[in-house]
Amino acid sequence: MQITILGSGVIGVTTAYYLAKLGHEVTVIDREEGPALETSFANAGQVSPGYPAPWAAPGIPLKAAKWLFQKHAPLILRLTTDPVQYRWLLQMLANCTDSRYKINKTRMVRVAEYSRDCLIELRKDTGIEYDQRSQGTLQLFREQYQLDGIGKDIEVLRQDGVPFEVLDRDGCVNVEPALAHAKDKFVGGLRLPNDETGDCFKFTNALAKIAEGLGVKFRFGVNIKSLLMSGGKISGVETSEGIVTAERYVVALGSYTPALIKALGLNAPIYPVKGYSITAPIVDESRAPVSTVLDESYKIAITRLGDRIRVGGMAEVSGFTDDLPAARRATLDLSVTDLFPGGDLKAATFWSGLRPMTPDSTPIIGGTRYDNLFINAGHGTLGWTMACGSGRLLADLISGNKADIRADDLGIARYN
């Protein structure tokens, strides 16, 4: 089949790769001049299938109220006049219950674990390189109450068969030796040994080259205007370079997905949650991380990417903004200086990206009420973690193949 994919982030490119492997003729369209130049460009770098946890969780409303008055809060709420923002926030609040948390986390772990397996298989098949490491993730707790409160997460990990270790201070230092100088800054940690790290931008560009070798065509610098309909199905994509037609269409536009499909009567409650990162060259190996360390207090991930440290995180609900506030940079600097002062922060680059978040933190993967229109979007902070699994899953669904994992609860129908 001829299939057009809208979006060349890590989700769009992995989808293109898996569709091409199944023999389809694939074209990818994007407004940027190359792959992964928006949200996939400088994310935190961790592939954490065992760590996914919904932002909508019991206790989050109270925590969010407290964070409003903190200088280095992990969540920043900047209200706008957009009613979409208020509706999304109300939907998120509705998911802050014990029952919804368990359902949503189980969905997330299912997709993420499958995606990690797909990534490993892809790596074996292609030999792709992207500064990858397979040395686990350490969630670091600065306060005892944080360590004492991981019972629900451990319950879900056990239920889903995800290996984990609860570590004391010495155990944390054993897996991340550079923490020896900061033992007074934390009380313990939760380690997920099967997690990985890697540069999402490098991966996406390398996979795009591989996909081109399989026949995928990329059309960059092309603005997507609208989806055209005829006879109850999608008949084409109106772009700045004319109308593009295909047999099947995939929308993988992250936070911009809702605007494109709204005219079709489809509701995708995906809202941009802004994240920040800095990337610094390593100047002191003894004070740099081995893999990824998650600073629970600031919701920040500190990741080793080759000879660089990537520090990323926070969640800012402020709409489609691209500013780089000094206060956000200060929070990133504070966390990494506290724990891993081995990077040259004076030489660091500062970046922000709009992470496409659903109210239940679960991505939208699957078909729509239009037989030839599919969606792969809304992965929030876990686009890199879930990319390969999401791409392969959707490729199987489009091709009519039996999916490797349950997919019926991942589609847009749960909102419409």
UniProtKB/Swiss-Prot annotation:
EC number: 1.4.99.-
GO biological process: D-alanine catabolic process
Statement: the UniProt record of this protein carries the keyword Lipid metabolism: no
Residues engaged in binding FAD: 3-17
Catalyzed reactions: a D-alpha-amino acid + A + H2O = a 2-oxocarboxylate + AH2 + NH4(+)
Enzyme class, broadest EC rank: oxidoreductase
Top-rank lineage group of the source organism: Bacteria
GO CC, any one term: cytoplasm
Coiled coil: none
Keywords for this protein: FAD, Flavoprotein, Oxidoreductase
Cofactor: FAD
Pfam families named among the record's database cross-references: DAO
InterPro entries from the UniProt entry: DadA, FAD-dep_OxRdtase, FAD/NAD-bd_sf
Molecular-function GO term, any one: D-amino-acid dehydrogenase activity
Pathway membership: Amino-acid degradation; D-alanine degradation; NH(3) and pyruvate from D-alanine: step 1/1
Similarity section: Belongs to the DadA oxidoreductase family.
Function, as annotated: Oxidative deamination of D-amino acids.
HAMAP family: DadA
Protein name in the entry: D-amino acid dehydrogenase
Native species: Brucella suis (strain ATCC 23445 / NCTC 10510)
